[in-house]
């Protein structure tokens, strides 16, 4: 009896395997419930390669796709780094390519979809990106483009899906695609999303991101799911060529006296509790330990309130709003994106200056209207929390102001990338407003060690700053 492979709910079933054959096949375990051997679907390529190399006969009932032809409607003339990335990826037909926002990751994927010639499932984090990808794919392929997400369930040889929808369907669609493309692939190692990769047999995998690093260090797991980091280009390498030239200005803002007093009081309450409870945020579970300890006593709950207050005061001080107004006045005629850490701050700024606000709560028709008005110049300023961090194309933006954000380097590189799409004569500038002598200041210092921030200028905490040097 020959060995047979079957796909079953995101795994592989192996029937008829001999004991001596199993010693050659890693990650294969006996399943008492089904009385057969089972392996993760992600191991399909490795298992099939081993079986062929060892000349072990087998029947493949798992794979439900075959080679396909996707001719391009128009010629692509890749930039040199895109061609290098494509050539490098094609050697293994697996791997992660890290390119800055605006450097043409989508066009690279189009090239590789055509070269690979396999039914392709493209994963994206948002519905906006799903629609954006479909528009580009329709420009280059005659083949119908399917969508999976936002209430649409239309599977085609080339399909774009949100990570959430792909996760739902992988148990029964995981054997129908030969190439998986993961846009913003740094999401992939997440506790849930990783199963979109684990549950698919696709032998060919392309990860796309601007910054593969994760705060939790799980980029190693990303490479296990998608292939190693095979090509990388940094923002500073493309500045002034493929991307617009840019500068980053960190502006230290001095809190108002009443804000400073509240901050110091709250900070003292919070840090005293940390010392007393011996909470160490350098520990991998430091944050979880802090949350647990703050829930165990009235003192802990007060410390948690103090933590939230000191954080809010440093991120959303009135002095920052004053400085933002100065920047808005200085950059009249430019297209500005204002970034905040949370929706509350974004809406506060929107109300203060009568500006349109984009968040995850903004309905799609309103979002599209805001983005169109931004492109035409009717709305020269957009305020957003995190919804523009990834993917949404705003090529006309040339000024970014980060009022507040997380400690994530990726988030700040993504926000920088929002304003770097090249235009003739374009000079981009990103301002970071940082409350001086606070935890936010030291977070900013760590972030500036990233190479994208080399050459950053730190402007001292003074009001009435002259910004003419940034023109």
Predicted regions and their residues:
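Accessory DNA-engaging acidic/polar modules
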Residues: 1-84
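Conserved segment of the helicase C-terminal RecA-like domain
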Residues: 418-446
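Conserved helicase/translocase motor-coupling segment
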Residues: 282-363, 367
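Post-DEXD/H (motif II) to motif III coupling segment of the RecA-like Helicase ATP-binding lobe
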Residues: 186-247, 258-261, 265, 272
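A short beta-strand element within the Helicase C-terminal
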Residues: 175-178, 220, 383, 390-406, ...
